[in-house]
Amino acid sequence: MLKKLQIVSLAAAVFASPLALADEPALALTFKDPSLKWGPCPEFIPKGCEIAVVHGDPSKPNVDVFFKVPGGFAIPEHTHTSAERMVLVSGTLEVTYQGQASTRLKTGSYAYGPPKRPHKATCANGAPCVLFIAFEEPLDAMPAPGAVK
């Protein structure tokens, strides 16, 4: 009887954990969703850049954001503590990581940015560029050492 009780208790613990996760609601939206709260980017990035938190807390690990700049906008060289996993959802963006050739991202392109690797980008003239970015670590952005301000 005791053995059956232990097995039932173990099974209850194993199956209860996924139920706790089920309390978190699923989320689906686009960068045009009116519920998004767009705010300014860090001061070293010129005016016109906007960021909206999609999921998570920017001061904690695992935060997702939309990052938006107008067509023709140059994003200065900068770094992040975290790796970045990005999908371009609008526009055409040329990205250059220090020590690598430039890459032209088109809508739907995926890009990975290693942590602390200096990079810069330019949005092509025309449509705004909007990136979905998933950060592993808390959200930050700093001008790259020696970057033109």
Where are these regions (language model features)?
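Bacterial N-terminal signal peptides that target proteins for export
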Residues: 1-9
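N-terminal signal peptide c-region/cleavage motif recognized by signal peptidases
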Residues: 16-18
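A short, N-terminal "cap"/entry segment at the start of jelly-roll beta-barrel domains
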Residues: 21-63, 146-149
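Double-stranded beta-helix
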Residues: 27-31, 120-149
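Short acidic-glycine-tyrosine-enriched beta hairpin
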Residues: 57-59, 93, 98-116
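Conserved short histidine dyad/triad with adjacent acidic residue
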Residues: 63-80, 114-116
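Glycine- and acidic-residue-biased ligand/ion/polar-headgroup-sensing regions
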Residues: 70-73, 80-99
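Short beta-strand His + acidic residue motifs that chelate non-heme Fe in jelly-roll/DSBH
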Residues: 75-77, 95-96, 113, 118-125
